[in-house]
């Protein structure tokens, strides 16, 4: 809640002085995307064009068998009423419009499509890109369509009470 209040103050201050074409906001890796999505959905002066999630492909390889164990671990958490980093990671994947696999140079290249396939089981609408040595084409950020709130509306409705309790 305080983070959204700080963000709102910063954006209002920025809009008083400038009319930016694009604002890029980097959040903490432990930040749940839903409050940010709701903030922009209800904002009259700025729109959310993309929600990027960066996922460490080396971590997925080692901790989640290249993504294969993400859904089973999430199911287990749901059955047991447990919330941990698995929930956060899966929910970040579910809400994002673009996913960037970092450290793609640190795993076997033929494993990247496997990781992408498991990510697409969680979010079939997300475009998955791998970056090697941290190189991202910045121009791609300027070619985004508006974020599709409809795709995540039901998910947001179901998760809102859970997230508010955290």
Language-model features: locations:
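Short, well-ordered beta-strand core segments
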Residues: 51, 99-100
């Amino acid at each position: 809640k305080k983070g959204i209040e700080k963000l709102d103050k910063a954006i209002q201050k920025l809009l008083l002085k400038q009319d930016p074409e694009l604002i890029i906001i980097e959040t903490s890796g432990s930040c749940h995307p839903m409050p940010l999505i709701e903030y922009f959905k209800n904002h009259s002066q700025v729109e959310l064009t993309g929600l990027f999630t960066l996922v460490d492909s080396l971590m997925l390889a080692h901790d989640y068998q290249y993504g294969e164990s993400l859904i089973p671990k999430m199911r287990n958490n749901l059955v047991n009423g447990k919330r941990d980093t698995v929930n956060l990671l899966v929910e970040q994947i579910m809400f994002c419009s673009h996913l960037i696999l970092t450290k793609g140079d640190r795993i076997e290249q033929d494993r990247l499509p496997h990781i992408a396939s498991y990510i697409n089981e969680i979010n079939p609408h997300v475009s998955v890109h791998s970056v090697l040595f941290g190189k991202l084409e910045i121009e791609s950020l300027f070619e985004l369509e508006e974020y599709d709130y409809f795709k995540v509306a039901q998910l947001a409705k179901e998760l809102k009470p859970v997230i508010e309790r955290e």
